[in-house]
Amino acid sequence: PPRAQPMTSPAVTRIEVAVRPELSDARGAGVSATIRSFLGIDVGRVRTRDVYRITGELSAGEAEKVRAEFTCPVLQVSALGKLEGEHFDFAIAVGFKPGVTDPVGRSAKVAVEDTLGRKLPDRAAVYTSTLYLVDGVERDQANRIALELLANPVIQTTRIESFDEWRAAPPDLSAPVVASHDTPAVATVDLTGTDAELEALSKRKLLALSSVEMRTIRDHFRSQTSSEARRSAGLGEQPTDVELECLAQTWSEHCKHKIFNATVRYQEGEREPEVIGSVFKAYVRGTTEAVERAVIEREGRSWLVSVFHDNAGVVEHDEQHHLVYKVETHNSPSALDPYGGAMTGIVGVNRDPFGTGIGAELSSNVWGYCFASPLYSGDLPKGLLHPRRIRDGVHQGVIDGGNQSGVPYGRGWELFDSRFLGKPLVFCGTVGVLPVTVAGRPGHEKGAEPGDAIVMVGGRIGADGIHGATFSSAALDESAPIQAVQIGDPITQKRMFDFLIEARDAGLYRSITDNGAGGLSSSVGEMAEKPGGAVLDLEKAPLKYAGLAPWEILLSEAQERMTLAVTPEQIGPLLELAARREVEATVIGQFTSDGYLRVRYGGRTVGLIDMEFL
């Protein structure tokens, strides 16, 4: 029978769980079939194991208790260290890179705490990985299986060992802990260069800003009014990295839709050129307004409640409820990491109806995919995944992301065309239900006021999800950064949503929005528009780990995180409810009316941006 190999590090507890050897491993059989059909390798048997690495001190008794809790004795065997007893040709271990969200690891940490009846330290974590034991392959084939099928090098690591190498080695106790900076610092960015130098700077920092936009930012910070305000705040004429990153996010194509709003000259064949003042105004807003006029003419009233200014559209349904609907794309992230990108897409679009008005309850999801043929057999451009791998990963990510957060799927479609080889089109949509009246006020209305507290609710801030807005606004190539990809955490999001619905019905917050493509930068920046300013203290924001630079804290996005505006009178009741529901809620600043977004870190101002310029 399988036996445990002793641990070699007191700081890491390693648990390995496998299907009992006399039983069929359905997951392994599925991997084996996929290897044959996708890679054309005549592979033998594949067995799988789940590996958990728990950082932090556990006693021998505690480790054994957790091992037993993580194992179904009817179907599984497990051991502290590693299981032995099965023969195979190669072992392929697949895990996450440092800083990438590990949703199963998060849930496993909660399970460890529940099992032990005590909280683990904040710095402790559970890191998960999967071990594939493969028969009938050579080393080069094992490498292909690892890199072309089992792992995504953008977000995952692989370790490949022959049976003899694996048996001779001690248990792998390495954990993908993020290496923190010694002293997170704020840098000043020099914008005095030529247009070519400014464009190179923009590309290097993944800002997705043109040279014209870079010059505009430079000139603004040089202006007299700006300089006087900056001197009083202890800042110079050059922007800090916090300010430049915030502006790049806010001005990105992803957030500003500059192409949709630009003047377009369109000519088809020999026809006369057509000048379109704005694709958005002409074909999106214009069509909506035309339909509304027709409805008013026919029925004498409009059923549109709120369109084009909140996170999703709101239309009348009955006397008690409005319908909220939002569809968005998640193309670039799905091209890099099909499963994680698509899961992020669906849980991301979930948060838009939830952040519309004072908060809509989610009803159902929809989806639509456009890929190249899954039977494609030609060469792939560098950095691109095979269409079939993208399709299968996207579909599984969308299904898992929706169903695991309690929002079922209503309908969907797929389309295949060779033009989607370079970049897939991934639609994700959500329908929500919004009460006409909530706590004595119209459900579709919201807005922060000066003096309201800024409260961050849900998942903590990490290195993933950084530059999501600017990355998705640029052309996709092989240099795409790992930080731009975030992995959704449906369980954390579900817990947060349930808490927020309860807080909504009790009237415990005044306004809400999501931490979308720019994290706190986008949510606080958007919410500060109505009151006219905000002071945001980045040091108060809860982090997954130490060492994040201030601009990273500001920009890191997450699907399971929301920002609230809360009156001083309701802060106590809101935080008490959050504690009872085991949802993290933290006051990180205050809305003001002085016309500036002020960002603080380390007891000083590190960002001062005029709200009108932003």
Language-model regions, residue ranges each:
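Acidic/polar loop patches that form or flank catalytic/metal-binding clefts of enzymes
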Residues: 410, 510, 536, 572-577, ...
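Short catalytic-loop micro-motif centered on adjacent basic/acidic residues
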Residues: 510-513, 563
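Repeat-solenoid scaffold signature
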Residues: 562-582
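A short, contiguous, amphipathic alpha-helix enriched in charged residues
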Residues: 528-532, 536-540
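Generic long, charged, amphipathic alpha-helical segments
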Residues: 538-549
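Core nucleic-acid recognition elements
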Residues: 2-488, 492, 501-506, 516, ...
